[in-house]
Amino acid sequence: MIIYRDLISHDELFSDIYKIREIADGLCLEVEGKMVSRTEGAIDDSLIGGNASAEGPEGEGTESTVVTGVDIVMNHHLQETSFTKEAYKKYIKDYMKSLKGKLEEQKPERVKPFMTGAAEQIKHILANFNNYQFFIGENMNPDGMVALLDYREDGVTPFMIFFKDGLEMEKC
């Protein structure tokens, strides 16, 4: 299994269990997820090691809730954040500067293609700004990558977009 982490914050963003494809001439990865519902807080009687009490109401003290969301977000504990268009422009400018610095250290051959392609991709993001939900890693590092969540034309299938050069891969 491959875990994809944020190059700057080192937060886990997604893994290779999802359908992943390159978009924007290899600049970004599009990761397709699905909507899931999970029950949280339920306690299985078989784990208690005894019989359920004959007295008192059934299930007393065990509250369970059903949580529905996108599997990528839930599995990797991504945190939703919000931006105005102006705030996102400021964030993405700072993020590109940080990422450019990291690329100059680690992959200097990627700096020029990344900076050229990123400008086009950012224009596309800003043109479709209202379609996106924004997510950051579990540690909520404001300098890390902000992943974009959108839905296919069917309105049901979620997908997330990540800058490929902002990711590091870890084999498990």
From Swiss-Prot:
Principal subcellular localization: cytoplasm
Modification Phosphoserine, positions: 46, 53, 64
Annotated TCTP domain residues: 1-172
GO BP terms, alphabetized: negative regulation of ectoderm development; negative regulation of intrinsic apoptotic signaling pathway in response to DNA damage; response to virus; spermatogenesis; stem cell population maintenance
Compartments, record wording: Cytoplasm
Recorded superkingdom: Eukaryota
Pfam families tied to this protein: TCTP (PF00838)
Keywords noted in UniProt: Calcium, Cytoplasm, Phosphoprotein
Gene3D superfamilies the record matches: Metal Binding Protein, Guanine Nucleotide Exchange Factor, Chain A
Disulfide-bond pairs as recorded: none
InterPro entries hit by this protein: Mss4-like_sf, Mss4/transl-control_tumour, TCTP, Translation_control_tumour_CS, Translational_control_tumour_p
Molecular function per GO: calcium ion binding; DNA-binding transcription factor binding
GO cellular component: cytoplasmic microtubule; cytosol; extracellular space; multivesicular body; nucleoplasm; nucleus; spindle pole
Region called Required for reduction of TSC22D1 protein stability, residue ranges: 70-172
Function summary: Involved in calcium binding and microtubule stabilization. Acts as a negative regulator of TSC22D1-mediated apoptosis, via interaction with and destabilization of TSC22D1 protein.
Assembly with partners or alone: Homodimer. Interacts with STEAP3. Interacts with TSC22D1; interaction results in the destabilization of TSC22D1 protein.
UniProt record similarity statement: Belongs to the TCTP family.
Protein name: Translationally-controlled tumor protein
The species this protein was found in: Mus musculus
